[in-house]
A protein has these predicted regions:
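Catalytic glycan-binding domains that act on GlcNAc-containing polysaccharides
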Residues: 238-246, 274, 333, 338, ...
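Generic helix N-cap/helix-start motif at coil->alpha-helix transitions
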Residues: 36-40, 61-70, 81-82, 95-105, ...
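Alpha-helical adaptor scaffolds
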Residues: 74-78, 91, 103-108, 256-267, ...
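C-terminal motif of bacterial Sec signal peptides marking the signal peptidase cleavage site
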Residues: 26-27
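Structural motif corresponding to the intra-repeat A-B loop/turn of tetratricopeptide repeats
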Residues: 80, 109, 113, 144-146, ...
Length: 623
């Protein structure tokens, strides 16, 4: 794409012509116009102010696209330590998400090699906002930064360790609390990071290979907490009981927490609670606490739930999930005032699932009235002139022309880079710009980042409304639910393709499309058109609901994970929010909560009556 063509497309977008020709869309799709964005009258009286005058330098679209085509080779060169080649590329490229990614890969290679001098030089060139945890760990390990909080986070985390963060921990192992250090060894063993665990144990003075002492005990514990052992928790629990006498209380207490969590993830909540009762809470990770709480929640053991949340690390207690459920636990025990205080805290965490539920517990409902005006054409054009924004849009439009999904993902990364330090008025202007270009996923992304200035028309866009409403009516499903699902599935990207092959706006698998096509008299290739994708997706939503006791929550889980799994996760009849929170797959658990939250916001925007999330979640029937 030439610069002149790109600027022409930009100008026509500013003039309100949003039907940019996109090769990957069908002819039908090209005729579909997004619904016009109309701020609420009250907001329209308040002109947008405070939009930043960004002036980052621009490159030509050809230079931007050429850099993209060199990106993979430069990334590989950085990972392999081709210092001169990487340095030459970075010296000729403007700062971008691409250059930050390449520099980050180079820094990790330098860290692995122990080249402190060159690491220091390159680290200084990486902005604070672009530094990931591993590069920060290397910087702290090399003494470039003093970061005691980072060291503590690495020590306390239940996550797998990166090489940089392992180096930081290894270099400081003599100065940390020994009990917490041995706990970290256990966490590594439970995650099968045995080499790291072995190195740490040796640094602590008791190698795992010893025949006695702490290291030998940890190695013995490993046999019942490894990922393989977690797959057979019953047999592993028997072995742990047999060896408990030769372990310390902390070692056995950690082991019980690991196996209890394995039971909980397998939906065996009563067995999980029995093992959690033997666990040492000081040894539990946040993941263990989460499943301990979910196990208590599933059985409505409110007093236990209250106690478990109170035992969590402070960061866990502050999470909206546990603010809300502790409020519910306190309310169930008659502590109304304390519950209300926690609901107020949860309600202030944004517009997430638990913020909405907490708002309703306080006797209120969500509002989708905008408090910010639509950005003016001049303000939007001002944003478009910024070099970083220009780069993202150049890659976006070229990706459409070339049907290059990988390039589109990089365009998304460049948009995140371009907007990461924008203030709220600028974010809303950027969201409008992205919307004008039909870069829908990044319009939503930008609008979602504001906390005070709110434009719900940009947060919850409704493109292709005629098609969505037509097929929603035809298949008897709620259009707000359909929009909520599309927003989560694809962010309205017609060419979206998942890692497992799901396609289009509604992320329908090709095999599923063939089955649907046979049942309703379609050509399965219509999956790749907008009309066909929405028709198939809405039919599948209706089918999932009918197969899952006409329940939207079950159908949403089934749409993501399959009807069989959604059915397996049922027990006796329970509150929909409890069902959602105890789904064992983190992706599906998050998906259900987001789709259902989206649905109530769309219902409000579309002036439908069902705007209560608690009512929409309802009761999930028993199997």
């Amino acid at each position: 794409m030439t610069l002149e063509l790109f600027m022409y497309l930009t100008r026509i977008a500013f003039n309100g012509i949003t039907g940019i020709a996109v090769a990957i869309l069908s002819a039908c799709a090209a005729q579909q116009k997004p619904v016009e964005l109309k701020p609420e009258p009250a907001a329209a009286q308040q002109p947008m102010t405070g939009v930043q005058a960004l002036q980052r330098p621009s490159e030509t679209p050809d230079k931007i696209v050429n850099d993209f085509y060199r990106f993979d080779s430069m990334q590989a060169a950085a990972k392999n330590g081709a210092d001169a080649q990487v340095a030459q590329f970075l010296s000729t490229a403007q700062p971008s998400a691409m250059t930050e990614s390449i520099r980050t890969a180079w820094l990790k290679n330098l860290g692995t090699r122990g080249d402190v001098a060159q690491f220091r030089q390159q680290y200084a060139l990486l902005p604070e906002a672009g530094r990931d945890p591993e590069t920060k760990c290397y910087a702290a390990a090399f003494g470039i930064e003093q970061n005691s909080r980072l060291l503590n986070d690495v020590l306390e985390s239940g996550d797998k360790l990166s090489a940089g963060c392992f180096l930081l921990l290894q270099k400081n192992i003599g100065s940390v609390n020994q009990s917490r250090a041995w706990r970290r060894v256990r966490i590594l063993l439970a995650a099968d990071q045995v080499a790291y665990a072995r190195t740490l144990a040796a640094a602590l003075g008791s190698p795992l290979e010893n025949t006695d002492g702490a290291g030998a005990q940890e190695n013995q514990l490993r046999s019942v907490i490894s990922t393989a052992a977690q797959k057979t928790p019953q047999a592993s629990a028997v072995r742990l009981q047999q060896m408990a006498g030769s372990l310390t209380g902390e070692q056995a207490g950690f082991g019980w927490g690991v196996l209890a969590t394995a039971y909980a993830k397998d939906q065996q909540f009563d067995q999980a609670l029995a093992l959690y009762a033997q666990a040492d809470r000081s040894q539990l990770t946040q993941e263990h606490f989460d499943w301990f709480a979910r196990s208590a929640l599933r059985g409505k053991h409110w007093q236990t739930l209250d106690s478990v949340i109170a035992s969590m690390p402070e960061s866990g207690q502050r999470d909206a999930t546990w603010l809300y459920w502790r409020g519910r636990a306190l309310a169930a025990q008659g502590h109304s005032a304390e519950a209300q205080a926690l609901y107020r805290q949860a309600a202030q965490t944004g517009r997430n699932f638990y913020a909405v539920l907490a708002t309703e517990e306080l006797g209120q409902r969500i509002s989708t009235q905008n408090n910010a005006a639509q950005a003016s054409a001049a303000q939007v054009e001002q944003i478009s002139k910024d070099g970083a924004v220009h780069r993202a849009l150049s890659l976006f439009h070229t990706s459409l022309q070339n049907q290059d999904w990988k390039m589109r993902r990089q365009a998304q990364n460049e948009w995140r880079y371009a907007t990461r330090e924008m203030n709220e008025p600028t974010l809303l202007a950027a969201a409008q710009l992205a919307y004008n270009h039909q870069f829908y996923e990044m319009a939503i992304y930008s609008a979602d980042k504001t906390n005070h200035l709110l434009n719900y028309n940009l947060r919850y866009i409704t493109p292709y409304r005629d098609l969505v409403q037509t097929y929603s009516r035809q298949h008897g499903v709620d259009a707000a639910w359909v929009y909520g699902l599309i927003r989560q599935e694809s962010r309205f990207v017609m060419g979206a393709q998942s890692s497992v092959g799901a396609q289009g706006l509604m992320q329908v698998m090709p095999a599923t499309a063939r089955e649907i096509a046979r049942k309703i008299g379609m050509d399965s290739q219509q999956l790749y058109t907008m009309d066909g994708n929405i028709r198939m997706g809405t039919w599948y939503m209706a089918d999932a609901r009918s197969r899952l006791q006409n329940n939207e929550v079950l159908a949403t889980a089934g749409y993501n994970a399959g009807p069989g799994r959604a059915r397996k996760w049922q027990g006796s009849a329970m509150e929909g929010a409890i069902y959602a929170e105890t789904i064992p797959f983190s992706e599906t658990r998050d998906y259900v909560k987001k789709v259902m939250t989206n649905a109530v916001y769309y219902a409000s925007i579309m002036q439908q009556p069902n705007t209560s999330l608690k009512q929409r979640m309802g009761t999930v029937p028993g199997r």
